[in-house]
Amino acid sequence: MKTSVAARLRVGAVPFLNARPLVFGLEQGIARERVELQYDVPSVLASRMAAGDLDVALLPTIELARIPGLVVVPGLGISARGPAASVILVCKKPLAEVKSVALDPDSRTSNALVQVLFRETWKTRPLFSMGASDLAASLLKHDAAVRIGDKALFEPLPAGTEAVDLGAAWTRARGLPFVFAVWAARSGVVDREIYDALHQSKRQGLRVLDLIALDYTWRGIQDPEKSLDYLTRNMSYRLGAPELASLGSFLASARSAGVLEHDAEVALAAFGKAAGRPIAPARTRARALAGRVER
């Protein structure tokens, strides 16, 4: 008996190039009877997940500490060890002289990351406020602006500005990759079939990165060489021990910086003997996070 459309899991993903390898197989029909894909920017996915409008989402990692009752699908994420290319701070002044920063309305994690970096790495305390979708409008009122996704990757920088890569800044400071997003779900939603489907979707996507890059277009811009270089050199889709250590460190630092109001408890979904590792902070003196595994 076929699963009805109403019974499908509502699965949210971002409409950015960096997510294409993860959703490629789902778009080709993997778990078609179980999954209904929906697309939106990270900040909207987070709001919809918090409101109960999604069952599974490619969620900004900072939201794991804000939305209760979520579990992380083991082994899958969007991360960068070094330059991320699509997560930048566009500056009109040197970092030491930046007094005001426009946050990206599409972002949650990168907005938190820039606040952690200013506090713990760059040792300054600029004012942060929500910026505009238009970069020029944000820079009219601020010394710097956060940009994420395809607009950060493909949009030319305004004259007289420089870009600071936030992924590279994190890795230089911590020696760890930075995890921008993970597949997160409501507890009890992800069964073995969905777990396998998400992993199979990624495997299919990674096998055809050249085709993904060739087909991808953003606002009329099609640059297969740049897209392929980005997918193969900047982005990583694993969620192993280094990524989990980094995630714990980031959430603890966000708590210390006042970005989070409380310590985070993050759980990895597990199925029988496939239990994942609890997430714990690394290289930080912030209070320990409570790691647990859903069984």
Per-segment meaning from a language model:
Residues 130-216:
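Pocket-lining segment of extracytoplasmic ligand-binding domains
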Residues 79-87, 157-187, 261-281:
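Periplasmic-binding protein-like
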Residues 25, 87-95, 100, 178-192:
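A bilobed periplasmic-binding-protein/Venus flytrap-type ligand-binding module shared by bacterial periplasmic
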